[in-house]
């Protein structure tokens, strides 16, 4: 099964860039041949071709839960963002709309690994809490890849 890991986020805003940091760390560690990892930042449309080819997509992004604790890692389906809920993407990505732009007849399975941010401020680095949580985030992604 061809799996696509999408690291989303804005690297200029500290923890908002956690998806990008996670994608880069995963690339450094290495992945199975059938896994493609893309650091797409906030340019999800740039991944359209890869999205069309994927059978499974794992999205990694900063999300805010109603009573979330910074550094918490959540696993949720894509449709968790399609209606007002207690969880919100940090930069309002709408992968479900992007999927509709593809020529696919069968949508891929999509899982979101969301990470509760501690700090959203001008910085290229993750906050200490999220930097410490990065191995947990990578492990959550690896579990999805292996599933």
Predicted regions and their residues:
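N-terminal catalytic or cofactor-binding beta/alpha core of small enzyme domains
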Residues: 1-117, 124-135, 140-147
């Amino acid at each position: 099964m061809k799996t696509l890991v999408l690291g989303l986020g804005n690297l200029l805003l500290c923890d908002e860039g956690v998806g990008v940091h996670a994608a880069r760390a995963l690339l450094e560690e290495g992945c199975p041949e059938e896994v493609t990892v893309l650091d797409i930042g906030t340019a999800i449309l740039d991944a359209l071709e890869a999205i069309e080819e994927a059978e499974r997509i794992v999205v990694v992004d900063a999300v805010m839960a109603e009573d979330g604790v910074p550094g918490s890692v959540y696993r949720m389906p894509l449709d968790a963002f399609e209606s007002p809920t207690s969880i919100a993407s940090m930069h309002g990505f709408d992968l479900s709309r992007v999927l509709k732009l593809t020529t696919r007849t069968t949508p891929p399975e999509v899982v979101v690994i969301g990470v509760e941010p501690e700090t959203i401020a001008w910085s290229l680095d993750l906050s200490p809490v999220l930097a410490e949580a990065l191995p947990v985030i990578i492990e959550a992604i690896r579990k999805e890849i292996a599933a």
